[in-house]
Regions:
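Conserved catalytic-core motifs of GNAT/GCN5-like acyltransferases
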Residues: 37-41, 121-122
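Short acidic/glycine-enriched loop/turn segments that link adjacent beta-strands
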Residues: 123-127
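N-terminal beta-loop-helix "entrance" segment that forms/cooperates
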Residues: 44-51
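Glyoxalase I/VOC metalloenzyme domain signal
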Residues: 1-11, 15-37, 51-58, 63-116, ...
Length: 172
């Protein structure tokens, strides 16, 4: 009997890096994916382990088929889901993201599965939560029309990519 899939399909795989340009080029050379949409200096108000925090990151996003690949470069030492990895120099796989229509119901399922809420972020019309898992973070994102349009724009750029302009910078 196959185990139950509590959260639906994985919608994103997140990686930490200290060099988005080099990491994006590597992914493109080895996987043929691109272009990358980069947002620099993104500041987010968060709650990490019950305490308010502000984190600053550079982030770049692309798609491989229907899976979003996210590169995150943490720019600060504020409490965040990224801090321990950054301090230890642990770059690479960081989290799996699941998109949900009901984040509260998904959070209850996560807790019943033994995952622990660590961080909540409200940014760009969305609510994101990070949960501690066994060696990898689980991220839940509340689906919204605004986010679907934004991610749809990035996916369309990937579907139509001609191999030029590896990184496209946008402001949030």
């Amino acid at each position: 009997m196959q185990p139950e899939n509590l959260f639906g399909p994985i919608t994103q795989i997140g990686y930490l890096t200290d060099d988005i340009e080099t990491t994006a080029a590597f992914w493109t050379q080895t996987s043929g994916i691109g272009p990358w949409t980069r947002m620099s200096g993104v500041s987010m108000a968060t709650t990490m382990d019950g305490e308010p925090s502000t984190i600053n990151i550079d982030v770049a996003i692309t798609y491989k088929d229907d899976i979003q690949i996210e590169l995150i470069n943490p720019l600060c030492d504020s409490p965040s889901p990224y801090l321990a990895n950054k301090r230890a120099g642990l770059w690479g796989l960081h989290h799996m993201q699941f998109t949900t229509k009901d984040i509260n119901a998904s959070m209850e399922l996560a807790k019943s599965a033994g995952l622990e809420l660590a961080c909540t972020i409200k940014q760009g019309g969305g609510v994101y939560t990070y949960l501690r898992g066994h060696g990898v973070w689980f991220e839940m994102i509340q689906a919204s029309e605004e986010l679907e349009m934004f991610f749809g724009m990035i996916k369309s750029a990937c579907d139509d990519w001609d191999g030029k302009e590896l990184i496209r910078d946008i402001a949030l």
